Amino acid sequence: MIRNISDEYVYKKEVDWSLLMEGLTLPVDNQLVFGQIMGRFIHRGETKDITLYLEGKSYSAKIVNVNFDPRFKRKKDTYQIRYSRNGDLAKALQVYFAKSYQFIKAARDNRDPTDRKMIKLPDEYKEYLAIYTTEYDDSYILEPILVDDMQLLRETVKKH
């Protein structure tokens, strides 16, 4: 239970191509937390400007409640955090998550162009991006959890 919303962990996203390029979709469970933090829920088709901080540098982004075509008969809202494709944040994430980026890029370059399946990283390449709230309803802190960090954690756990 969140007692104080400021500086609380909100979500951990496994790195994938979308995250490295333009954004991420928030699971339904996390949408409630984001709505509480913002002080309101955004309606379908609505966006809210936000600031994401990565290693002390600020980046502009948006939280979007996706307005899907009515033909899809979506009952639940879908929140996404979006930023400019190949913009400053995307480029910074590609640098931080260089191992994941290189693995996914090589797999995309070497597959059949008609294959649109999401490329999953093997365990030894898995990296994550943790999202934390701040005292402001439009600002979030991003923390990279790199593959080297994960390997160090596994080794530490094995020793104990």
Residue positions per predicted region:
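Acidic, low-complexity intrinsically disordered regions
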Residues: M1-H160
